[in-house]
Amino acid sequence: MLNPINKTIELGDGRTITIETGKLAKQADGAVTVRMNNTVLLATVCAAKDANPGVDFMPLQVEYKEKYSAFGRFPGGFTKREGKASDYEILTSRLVDRALRPLFPDNYHAEVYVNIILFSADGEDLPDALAGLAASAALAVSDIPFNGPISEVRVARTDGKYIVNPTSAELEKADIDIMVAATIDNIMMVEGEMNEVQESEMLEAIKVAHEAIKVQCKAQLELSEACGKLVKREYCHEVNDDELRKDVHDKCYAKAYAVATSGSGKHERSEAFEKIVEEYKAQFSEEELTDEKLEMIGRYYHDVEKEAMRRAILDEGKRLDGRKTTEIRPIWIETDCLPGPHGSAIFTRGETQSLSTVTLGTKSDEKMIDDVLNHGYERFLLHYNFPPFSTGEAKATRGVGRREIGHGNLAHRALKRMIPDNYPYVVRVISDILESNGSSSMATVCAGTLALRDAGVPMKKPVSGIAMGLISENKGTNYAILSDILGDEDHLGDMDFKVTGTKDGITATQMDIKVDGLSYEILENALAQAKEGRMHILGKILEAQPEAREDLKPHAPRIETMIIGKEFIGAVIGPGGKIIQGIQEKTGATVSIDEVDGVGKIEISGTNKATIDAAVKAIKAIVAVPEIGEVYEGKISSIMPYGAFVEFMPGKDGLLHISEIDWKRLETVEQAGLKEGDTVSVKLVDIDPKTGKFKLSRKVLLPKPEGYEERPPRPERGERGPRQDRGDRGPRQDRGDRGPRREYRD
């Protein structure tokens, strides 16, 4: 018998979120459905009963999946079935993972699988803002050890107003779009994009999010209590030896502290740390060094390294590479470093290096997006690659991983608002990380800015980025904020806070917190210190490349855009695409046309200006309106005894009367040397107001012969007197069958 339990959360604006358990997926360790209007997600959690041997980390796997049926759609492709995860699904999975992972106990190593499935959607309420709540609620109603609950919300600012979990329509107009995850007491994760906002405005958005999250966390606690899941399962995944722990600390700490304050480079420092632990192990015999003991020594020595690094910073202000807490590593930059790409740059900061390239494309290069809720075309792409050799690892290069997609997305969001809305090119930025020792995604932002400017992309403003760190103790009462963190400072520290922006404000951010007790004061100070670092790096970028390249590189495609009336779209395309295909074949240019906002938007691209100009001329001829007094190049389509019909514009014929061919009198058109198919210059001299027929003249374009006398104009009938009697000519003879009268073509 079903006995579902549910809780309702009020958002404060009339909307509600309902969490329910006990109805679906009851064999999972925990399962809930979360509903907001017509958006419904199911979240389940399952954990192994014990940890696998040798595992000393948290093997958490979060999978967010969307069903096309949720929105009443069929999947694409031959199989008509959901396939591998989309970028949106991967990014949503990462948002949930980053919020949950720090809250599992440090000594809990059993495999945990979190599955979140979108079963219903209406396109208005976005499911990624509900996924974190669903996952945490599923853990709350399970017996899996978890120091939650948490929740995630999206906050947008539209017309100066902060909105929690905005609709898709509200989000389109927002200048702030951030996702925030938190417990009742602490912020855990922030990620989002902004339109050059100030640090105080971003901080206010985080505060608004946290207030909403507190309500959602309390609802989860009530749900957990109603389910009777307040007691968590027992586990023992680590064997400990307090005497060994003390011995490792006593014999290794001083040596580790000396290395931590030596200011040595990454590999030298790594070798020195490794030498210390190897020397410690050497005091034991092979029989004594069991696998269990080796695992404990490694774990205890890791704690020693961490303590040494943190104490050196907190007590002496000395960082691993010898820098001060606010100091940025040395930067060197090279632009236009590769001849083939349309733009290129190398950005190196300390031991982190990005080689970024830019490719400019046309409309045909747009990326088609066909997710469940998101479908359309993307014109600005950024791809981030992190090969193993960048950290000196000897292993095979696999496909694109979740981390690469996440880092690339952050850099993409940092730069995309700085590309002009009306920029005609499709742009692809590729960042290949060639060296890495922290802040590689921020190096991507800086290298991407440089490569875009080298390609001649007229960015609104250049963007720089920096990664900030934190070392704190005693609930944040004693702390040090670190600018431009190293990989080890990220790993052993309490915060990874990435901030990107222009001289006028923040464009994107990503923050992960690993400790309790991060105050808003620390966040405010971190943002202020980050701004100083960003401005320093931006100065280096502007020194290397003060302005964007004025013109594209010679081998970059050229694009020209035309706007035509909606009524001309069919004429340009032609029956079955005949006209537009003919233009492309004749000129060598690529032509695409779309109806946008009630007009026809034509994009013409080619490898050189001549091909584009030829295509533009052909299109203008199709859409042009004939004007009296204009001169046209036409083709004689047919010859008659009284003149010639000339196609002077596509689909438009006019009469070139025999008297308008030349200044001298002609008996036949052929006397002027004209024949069908000839090209002739004509001037449009008149348009019949009743019939719309066109009257052309060739002779007005020819020099008037010397001594030529104009024939006097024919007098009006009144001056010529009455018509004379026809006399004895009798009635008009039968004219016979002369056939149909020739019609003018217009």
From Swiss-Prot:
Its EC number is 2.7.7.8. The keyword Metal-binding applies. Residues 557-619 form the KH domain. Keywords: Cytoplasm, Magnesium, Metal-binding, Nucleotidyltransferase, RNA-binding, Transferase. It holds the Pfam family PNPase. It is an enzyme of class 2 (transferase). Residues 701-746 are annotated as: Disordered. It catalyses: RNA(n+1) + phosphate = RNA(n) + a ribonucleoside 5'-diphosphate. Its main location: cytoplasm. Mg(2+) binds at residues 490, 496. This is Polyribonucleotide nucleotidyltransferase. It comes from Parabacteroides distasonis (strain ATCC 8503 / DSM 20701 / CIP 104284 / JCM 5825 / NCTC 11152). The lineage of its organism: Bacteria, Pseudomonadati, Bacteroidota, Bacteroidia, Bacteroidales.
